[in-house]
Amino acid sequence: MKKLNSFVLDITVAILDFLYRGRDYQRFWVLEEIARAPYFAFLSVLHFRESMGLRGPEHLYLMKQHFEQSVNETEHLEYMESRGGNTYYIDRFVAKHLVLIYYWSNVVYYWVAPRLAYHLSYEVEIHAATTYAKYLADHGHDDKILEILNDELEHSRELEQAMEKIK
């Protein structure tokens, strides 16, 4: 299944690369819009599991982590909006439809195979960090982009910890 995760991510990245070539902040805005979806999905499933009496020992830790991650991704999203990332209707249209698919896919995936859902999100966070690093290499230093890059790397470490907690 990890190969499927990589395949799906590679296809999505190729599409985004094509659509957003030379449009960095629009691409970043779409990535940040999408980046929140798994954390919302994970929280939804954790709340549902709790309501069904299926809470595990890691439950509260994971809920706190995912809430903090979703807030952090929202801060990134707002920054990209301030840089004009959501100016065009087509970008908002693409992002909202990708989010809809990605959210519901993550709800099902997290319910059925949470470690694999975390792995996919881990790969997405690594891709985001790589994208920001490439931007910095091409455009020079930008404190806010560097901060966001470091946040994405921190999210990837948190996702690794989550995978360990639910063994």
Segments from the language model and where they lie:
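Non-heme di-metal
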Residues: 1-167
